[in-house]
């Protein structure tokens, strides 16, 4: 079949989000033909070029989501901004089109400015939102010029009137003209996919299935492909756009009214994406809970874990060497969300109980002023808490805490970093899908983690969990494993078995291979051109008779109630191992999931 893969700020560009996952998906399903529709985030990303594409990628269409303020578009011809956006250039609307535009923006603004519902379902503004959203899409398709109109004085006046209207939220009512100008600019940027020239019978109209690699802007072309051509939409989210907006809000340059308007817009857009999608897959149940809160139907949700390459860690995982028995290892990007400050204070407690313990911190190369400042702060705290210690009068003092960069001569790769210790520690206060934990599980290492994001779901009962921002609890868990090598080995073996059964690339590809076939069989695209021969005459048996009848084969099937349980946790396994295997799988998961800490070590 022909798959339209929709991305935002990632594949096929050499840098960006979900790049590796998309590349593995495309390369792992060579029986399908892929058309790529990619939105870029910056001029720098476009300058980095594309990754090498496999032969079954037949077409690539790109468009920028960045504005001239972020960087001047380079090049003319097909790579220029105006050539890839059917925006009409300097086209101005006539009186009838101006009236249509004002009506659609008014409906959209009324929905966005309305008080957000505090329950789990979307507010009543969803109807107005879809009316304005699809109205603008049809206007852009017919007339172009939408990007100029959304930045016009008309848009600002409509937003100002909607924020003053009855039913608007208190925060929105305090918005100033500057806030409305800022929101109009952000709205134009997010709605830029409405003006693309992708919505023709030879473009998105020619694919059998649209697969959006994320929600938000990447899913907008899929919404329009379904509306204009009836193409089914599959949405995969490893993180929720609304959650990302909330996490980034404290560092944003916008005021509270603009942040509130953007949050409301993303909420309504997410609800519409989930409503129109034939199926929505979540990278973990933490994301799945966010999707349900944003209005997704639980019957349309499935959990498909992101596949990871286990081969690079096989040598460490199969080796009998358990690493440094007194060494704790932390691996990841050094940034405030990882809370290395709490880890250092926890290690101070560990050293009081275990004087021979060591802590090795392996970080990726630091990028940015914030990360550089944070690393310097962590080094200063480590020097204060753990001054260099000498074993004798004529030996050089050595600190029990070391900061090492992955890629150096001593630690050329991640596998060597995980092999350096017997216990892997994760101290984050914010975490989505904990990739470093899965990698350590592939290496057969016992773990101590904070209970954030999808941590408990990933480790099941194969590691210890402590509350975030609690150095004493984190230290107690580390001490327990350092003093019990048998338990450490048992948990490491169970962790490796769990990771190999749930988090490999093969599991991920098998899940999407089945999903593609399921969606096409339940909702095939019927095109008039396919029903006619070369002479324009009706083609016999172009569609089976069953396609015209209502029956169970024409309705989407609910997700399976049961999910496969890992073999090491199935019936007949060793009682102790089964007790530590985690909790009962959640309905609708394609891979077994742990919905709670269970009654094992966690």
Question: How would you name each of these model-derived features?
Answer:
Residues 312-351, 359-365:
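Conserved donor-binding/catalytic core segment of Leloir-type glycosyltransferases
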Residues 372-409:
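Nucleotide-activated donor-binding/catalytic signature segment of Leloir-type glycosyltransferases, i.e.
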Residues 464-471, 480-486:
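Conserved acidic donor-binding segment of nucleotide-sugar-dependent glycosyltransferases
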Residues 452-465:
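Short acidic/histidine- and often glycine-rich active-site loop of Leloir-type glycosyltransferases
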Residues 271-275, 394-421, 442, 472-476:
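Short acidic alpha-helix that forms the nucleotide-activated donor recognition element
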Residues 444-449:
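Short hydrophobic beta-strand element within catalytic cores of glycosyltransferases
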Residues 429:
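Aromatic "clamp/platform" in nucleotide-sugar-dependent glycosyltransferases that forms part
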Residues 473, 487-502, 508-518, 528-532:
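A short, well-ordered alpha-helix in the C-terminal region of glycosyltransferases
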């Amino acid at each position: 079949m022909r798959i339209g893969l929709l991305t935002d700020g990632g594949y096929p560009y050499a840098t960006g989000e979900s790049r590796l996952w998309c590349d593995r998906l495309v390369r792992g399903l060579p029986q399908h033909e892929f058309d790529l529709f990619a939105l870029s985030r910056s001029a720098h990303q476009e300058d980095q070029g594309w990754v090498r594409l496999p032969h079954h990628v037949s077409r690539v269409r790109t468009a920028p989501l960045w504005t001239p303020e972020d960087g001047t578009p380079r090049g003319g011809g097909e790579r220029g901004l105006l050539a890839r956006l059917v925006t009409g250039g300097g086209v101005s609307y006539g009186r009838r089109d101006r009236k249509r535009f004002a009506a659609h923006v008014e409906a959209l603004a009324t929905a966005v400015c309305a008080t957000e519902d505090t329950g789990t379902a979307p507010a009543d503004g969803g109807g107005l939102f879809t009316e304005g959203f699809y109205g603008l899409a049809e206007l852009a398709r017919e007339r172009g010029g939408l990007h100029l109109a959304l930045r016009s004085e008309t848009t600002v006046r409509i937003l100002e009137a909607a924020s003053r209207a009855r039913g608007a939220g208190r925060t929105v009512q305090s918005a100033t003209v500057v806030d409305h100008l800022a929101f109009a600019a952000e709205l134009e940027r997010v709605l830029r996919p409405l003006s693309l020239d992708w919505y023709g019978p030879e473009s998105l109209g020619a694919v059998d299935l649209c697969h959006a690699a994320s929600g938000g802007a990447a899913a907008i072309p899929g919404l329009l492909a379904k509306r204009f051509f009836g193409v089914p939409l599959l949405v995969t989210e490893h993180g929720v756009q609304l959650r990302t907006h909330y996490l980034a809000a404290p560092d944003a340059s916008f005021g509270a009214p603009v942040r509130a308007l953007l949050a409301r817009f993303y909420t309504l857009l997410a609800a519409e994406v989930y409503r129109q999608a034939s199926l929505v897959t979540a990278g973990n149940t933490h994301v799945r809970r966010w999707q349900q809160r944003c209005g997704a139907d639980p019957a349309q949700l499935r959990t498909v874990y992101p596949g990871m390459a286990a081969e690079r860690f096989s040598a460490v995982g199969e080796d009998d060497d358990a690493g440094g028995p007194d060494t704790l290892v932390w691996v990841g990007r050094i940034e405030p969300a990882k809370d290395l400050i709490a880890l250092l204070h926890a290690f101070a407690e560990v050293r009081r109980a275990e004087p021979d313990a060591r802590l090795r911190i392996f970080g990726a190369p630091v990028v940015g002023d914030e990360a550089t400042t944070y690393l310097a702060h962590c080094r200063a705290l480590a020097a204060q808490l753990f001054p260099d210690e000498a074993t004798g009068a004529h030996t050089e003092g050595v600190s029990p805490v070391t900061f090492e960069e992955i890629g150096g001569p001593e630690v050329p790769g991640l596998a060597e970093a995980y092999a350096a210790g017997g216990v892997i520690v994760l101290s984050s206060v914010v975490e989505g899908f904990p990739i470093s934990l899965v990698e350590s599980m592939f290496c057969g290492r016992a773990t101590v983690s904070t209970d954030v994001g999808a941590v408990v779901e990933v480790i099941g009962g194969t590691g210890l969990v402590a509350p975030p921002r609690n150095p004493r609890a984190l230290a107690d868990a580390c001490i327990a494993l350092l003093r019990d090598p048998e338990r450490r080995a048992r948990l490491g073996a169970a962790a490796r078995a769990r990771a190999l059964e749930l988090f490999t690339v093969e599991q991920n590809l098998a899940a999407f291979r089945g999903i593609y076939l399921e969606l096409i069989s339940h909702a095939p695209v019927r095109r008039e051109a396919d029903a006619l021969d070369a002479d324009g005459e009706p083609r016999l048996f172009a569609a089976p008779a069953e396609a015209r009848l209502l029956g169970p084969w024409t309705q989407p099937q609910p997700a399976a109630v049961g999910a496969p349980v890992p073999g090491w946790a199935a019936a007949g396994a060793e009682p102790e191992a089964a007790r530590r295997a985690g909790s009962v799988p959640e309905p609708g998961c394609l891979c077994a999931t742990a919905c709670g800490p269970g009654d094992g070590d966690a």
